[in-house]
Amino acid sequence: MNGVYIWTETTDAGHAFVSVHQDNLIYVYTYGRFGRKGPATLTGDGILNFLTGDDARLYYREELYKYQARVFQIDDVTTEETRRIFESLWNSGKTPVFTEAMGDRTKRRGKVIDVYDLTDSNCTTHTVQVIREAGTKIFDTSYISTTTQLRIDNEEDFTIPVSLQRYLTEKSGDLSSMNVMEVTSSFREQHANIEHFKPNSESLTGRVEEGLANSASTVGSSSGYSGGTIGGVLGGSYDIDE
């Protein structure tokens, strides 16, 4: 089924990424610290992996079954525009410096597009930024001020996957907003767990990172502010240690 999908998983610090289905082909765009890392691994090369074919399908199965990812279809953006934005970023990126821990997929399909910062420039902020740039209105909110009775327009901003997942889950259950639909079960039907992956358990490092990212998201998912909005808290700590 053609469409644009946001994936979220919340094991440890979690992860968020985007995939596009177009003309029976799968395109996955996943950003993270997949290469060189700075102190405590909280910063590093910001690498965008662009996966297709068997790479993309295996990544789907890993996310669905190892990390219990959830999938949300976003109906108010086009496959063409979403692909154009991500592939423009990827095409303008640089080949990463290989590291011992770097995965094969990243060596083959990764490009450095910027500097990663857990609190400021991460998988969640990139996912939201690109989908917003592609034209979605799902992150636009408004409310009536109790003091002025005027309508206040706002934009939701997210730093951590758990906040994004919570927001998309609420949106998918809101019948007045038909532009977000959870499709996790249909993806599990289409992509069986042929490797018999077991769910990953959380690690201590992941819990520490989750706490840091949580603190950077300031007042919460509906505040309109995140570490990305206010510049992050680790911006000066990027110094490659490999």
Give short role names for the model-derived ranges.
Residues 125-129:
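Solvent-exposed, polar/charged alpha-helical surfaces in well-ordered, non-transmembrane soluble domains
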Residues 132-142:
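Substrate-binding/catalytic groove segments of enzymes
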Residues 145:
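Active-site cores enriched in adjacent His and Asp/Glu residues with nearby glycine-rich loops
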